[in-house]
Amino acid sequence: ESTRRQRQMCIRDRPYAYDALAAGGMSQETLEFHHDLHHKAYVDNGNKLIAGTQWENSALEEIITGTYQADAVAQNGIFNNASQHWNHIQFWEMMGPSGREMPSELSSAITAQFGSVDAFKEAFVAAGVGQFGSGWCWLVQQADGSLAITKTENGVNPLCFGQKALLGCDVWEHSYYIDFRNKRPAYLTNFLDNLVNWENVALRISG
């Protein structure tokens, strides 16, 4: 295997312990199942699918943008697994046991775009709840620098639309069913209030 492929398509260590998010509402059981089973499956399947193809030595982002909306079934499989791998990398990095206070530069940008932090949170939760079936809810920065809340189905992500992901929440049922059962609104609200590391989110925004 090429070293580039090993770097791009391999499960990363979590940036915190299995029980680090429990106090914030994500149990150790959820993190173990989600990271070690669901996320790992995307990586394993993705590596099998890109073996021997033009994407074998490509960067993860190149694979995603190059296979998005591809006609071939094999290409669709590559996209789904590569995109979900990327999505989960963002998901883990945007959470943490610290960073609950939103830095002033981020809160100012959010307030300027959405009216207030509370209004942003309400809109984010509404978008996540409104995503029918599996998918993701995002806070993105668009090419013109403005912020927007988007939702994407299945494994589609902001890279497909030339947007920068600042914050992403997994709304596939496996991400919340152990801890919240079918209460997706409660899961999304808790994600924003008790799981997001806003300091990490602020580092992603471009001036």
Model-derived features: where do they sit?
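Histidine-anchored, small-residue-rich loop motif
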Residues: 20, 25, 45, 168, ...
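An amphipathic alpha-helical core segment
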Residues: 126-182, 188-199
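Alpha-helical scaffold segments that form or flank carboxylate-/histidine-based iron centers
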Residues: 24-38, 61-86, 154-156, 161-169
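Single conserved hydrophobic/aromatic residue that forms the stacking wall/gate
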Residues: 1-7, 11
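N-terminal regions that are enriched for targeting/export leaders
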Residues: 12-21
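Active/ligand-binding-proximal structured segments within catalytic/core domains
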Residues: 42
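Low-complexity, Gly/Ser/Thr/Pro-rich intrinsically disordered linker/tail segments
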Residues: 199-207
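All-alpha RGS (Regulator of G-protein Signaling) helical domain and cognate RGS-like helical scaffolds
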Residues: 37, 48-57, 69-142
